């Protein structure tokens, strides 16, 4: 169990909360996290790269020159893979790159990733009322008060994403917004700081804690 300090909009400590998650064993943690990251990246691939074989390329039906007597290398088609404009040998075709992972493993990987970032997890009160209108500067200053530096890559986790917060955060470098029910291992591990609202943390614990 990890105890986390809760901060308000001004950056003052207003309470504490605990992060209690069942995580993978130390000897298997890196393996299950690796599988989850590879799965996430593989599932994001479109897999629509496509090339044409010599059978699919337009043209090439006529023999370029006769078999013998010209002194040139024999050729049966000007769409051979050896020719410019010819087909591609063993080129990519549309395919599905998606990988499967058991639900229990996915949840365990996510809990393990969250727990590994506990030292860099910042819990804040719901700050939507503090931004009635989109204000990028105000949100950037709040992140600084919460202990985030310009070099940090931040994952901002909210239970819901109001439009005013979305518009305020979209022009801040290295800040990514995500809903609590959409978090994934890749985004958690790639961030140097996690900033989550109390509501978002409660939702995460409700959904993912075993």
Curated annotation (Swiss-Prot):
Membrane-spanning intervals of the chain: none
UniProt keywords (A-Z) are: Ribonucleoprotein, Ribosomal protein, RNA-binding, rRNA-binding
Pfam families found in the cross-reference section: Ribosomal_L4 (PF00573)
Q: Where is this region: Disordered?
A: 46-96
- Bias (Basic residues) occurs at 60-71
Instruction: Say if the entry is tagged with keyword Nucleotide-binding.
Output: no
Q: Which GO terms describe its biological process?
A: translation
Q: Name one GO cellular component term.
A: ribonucleoprotein complex
Q: Which GO terms describe its molecular function?
A: rRNA binding; structural constituent of ribosome
InterPro entries under this entry?
Ribosomal_uL4, Ribosomal_uL4-like, Ribosomal_uL4_dom_sf
Q: Which family does it belong to?
A: Belongs to the universal ribosomal protein uL4 family.
Quaternary organization: Part of the 50S ribosomal subunit.
Q: Which PANTHER family match?
A: 50S RIBOSOMAL PROTEIN L4, LARGE RIBOSOMAL SUBUNIT PROTEIN UL4C
Q: What does this gene product do?
A: One of the primary rRNA binding proteins, this protein initially binds near the 5'-end of the 23S rRNA. It is important during the early stages of 50S assembly. It makes multiple contacts with different domains of the 23S rRNA in the assembled 50S subunit and ribosome.
Instruction: Name it.
Output: Large ribosomal subunit protein uL4
């Amino acid at each position: 169990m990890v105890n986390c300090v809760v901060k308000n909009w001004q950056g003052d400590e207003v309470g504490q909360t605990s992060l209690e998650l069942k995580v993978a064993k130390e000897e298997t943690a890196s393996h299950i996290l690796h599988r989850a990251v590879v799965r996430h990246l593989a599932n994001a691939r479109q897999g629509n790269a496509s090339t044409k074989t010599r059978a699919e390329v337009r043209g090439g039906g006529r023999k370029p020159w006769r078999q013998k007597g010209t002194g040139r290398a024999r050729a049966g088609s000007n769409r051979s893979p050896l020719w410019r404009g010819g087909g591609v040998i063993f080129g990519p075709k549309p395919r599905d790159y998606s990988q499967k992972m058991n639900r229990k493993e996915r949840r365990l990987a996510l809990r393990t990733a969250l727990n590994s970032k506990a030292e860099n997890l910042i819990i804040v009160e719901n700050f939507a009322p503090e931004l009635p209108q989109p204000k990028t500067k105000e949100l950037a200053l709040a992140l600084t008060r919460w202990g985030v530096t310009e070099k940090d890559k931040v994952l901002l986790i909210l239970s819901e994403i109001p439009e005013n917060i979305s518009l305020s955060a979209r022009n801040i470098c290295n800040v990514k917004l995500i809903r609590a029910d959409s978090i994934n291992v890749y985004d958690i591990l790639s961030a140097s700081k996690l900033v989550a609202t109390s509501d978002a943390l409660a939702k995460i614990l409700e959904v993912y804690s075993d």
